[in-house]
């Protein structure tokens, strides 16, 4: 499966900045205009991606209308962070096509994905294969997913689970302590997880300050998802300022991290048994993604919705005709 537009955008931003801020809007807690205004403040403050989703209630009309309103106000990718098969809307650019790696129930590992795959394909939004790992305390998402929570003290278990996710095909790994977690996971756990991965790694849960964001990025995370830290700010100016300070801290730590990473030529000399020295074999340059500015194709979505409505109307007419014919036969 080829990378979609949103996934290419993520890789391009990481190559340039070394870290991303992903702002989460939960339509159940921030519906309609309220959620759209918060998303706009986040985008203006420097959020790289707007995530939309939640564990409870983020579906149906509330999800559709809120996401559409957000789309009209921001010009960054909107990625769905689904809580179930109902958390899908055509007004987003992409969806975390997630499986909960440490759930005790097969539903969250494969069944819900089977239910959701045809819907994602019909809507034409880009799926991003995502391995999702729930850490303690887990909060609502841990309870709903019936997760075998990974303790913050066991970075080795988190790393092994993340590695399994990548081997199973995940192109993004997310570890989440749960919405409303009192504090983020320790740097040791973040470092352990990132040390085994070659795909982008995002941390979520408990990160509320620029200082905490700096520590998480320095420990190795490629991005931080923030939701609860923005939910309780009624003043949109304060939301914007908070996002701006966290975004600045993430970008600063990310660029420092990029500087400290060895180049491909240097790596080839460190591990000569596995990679030919650069004087014998020069590694090709990494491809750079020229991602165009995000523009939402409203016409395509409206056309799909109109076609779907026509199909429903035709089915309704068929049903009425069938009912009339059936009643005439009985007479």
Write out the residue ranges for each language-model feature.
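Short beta-strand/loop segments at the ligand-binding rim of alpha/beta enzyme cores
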Residues: 17-23, 67-82, 195-204
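Active-site mouth loops of central-metabolism enzymes
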Residues: 19-35, 82-84, 137-158, 202-208
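Glycine-rich phosphate-binding active-site loops on the catalytic face of alpha/beta enzymes
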Residues: 51-57, 98-109, 177-179, 206-207, ...
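C-terminal helical cap(s) of enzyme catalytic domains, especially alpha/beta-barrels
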Residues: 67, 229-258
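Catalytic cores of alpha/beta
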Residues: 80, 84-97, 199, 203, ...
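Conserved anion-binding
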Residues: 87-166
């Amino acid at each position: 499966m080829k990378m979609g537009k949103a996934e290419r955008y993520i890789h391009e931003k990481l190559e340039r900045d070394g870290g991303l801020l992903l702002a989460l809007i939960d339509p159940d807690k921030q519906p309609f205009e309220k959620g759209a205004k918060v998303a706009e403040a986040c985008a203006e403050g420097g959020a790289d991606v707007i995530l939309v989703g939640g564990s409870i209630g983020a579906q149906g009309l509330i999800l559709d209308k809120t996401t559409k309103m957000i789309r009209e106000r921001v010009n960054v990718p909107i990625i769905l962070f689904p809580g179930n098969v109902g958390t899908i809307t055509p007004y987003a650019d992409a969806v975390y096509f997630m499986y909960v790696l440490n759930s005790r129930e097969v539903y969250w590992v494969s069944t819900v994905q089977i239910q959701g795959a045809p819907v994602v394909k019909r809507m034409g939004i880009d799926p991003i294969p995502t391995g999702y790992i729930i850490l303690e305390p887990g909060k609502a998402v841990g309870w709903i997913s019936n997760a075998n929570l990974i303790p913050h003290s066991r970075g080795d278990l988190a790393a092994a689970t993340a590695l399994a996710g990548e081997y199973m095909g995940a192109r993004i790994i997310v570890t989440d302590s749960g919405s409303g977690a009192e504090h983020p996971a320790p740097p040791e756990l973040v470092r352990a997880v990132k040390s085994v991965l070659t795909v982008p790694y995002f941390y979520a849960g408990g990160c509320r300050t620029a200082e905490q964001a700096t520590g998480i990025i320095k420990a190795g995370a490629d991005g931080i998802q923030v939701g609860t830290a923005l939910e309780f700010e009624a003043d949109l100016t304060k939301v914007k300022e908070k996002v701006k300070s966290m975004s600045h801290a993430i970008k600063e730590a990310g660029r420092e991290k990029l500087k400290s990473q060895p180049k491909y030529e240097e790596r080839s000399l460190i591990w000569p048994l596995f990679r030919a020295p650069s004087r014998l074999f020069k590694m090709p340059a990494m491809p750079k993604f020229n991602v165009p500015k995000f523009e939402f194709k409203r016409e395509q979505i409206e056309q799909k919705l109109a076609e779907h409505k026509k199909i429903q109307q035709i089915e309704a007419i068929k049903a009425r005709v069938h009912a009339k014919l059936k009643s005439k036969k009985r007479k």
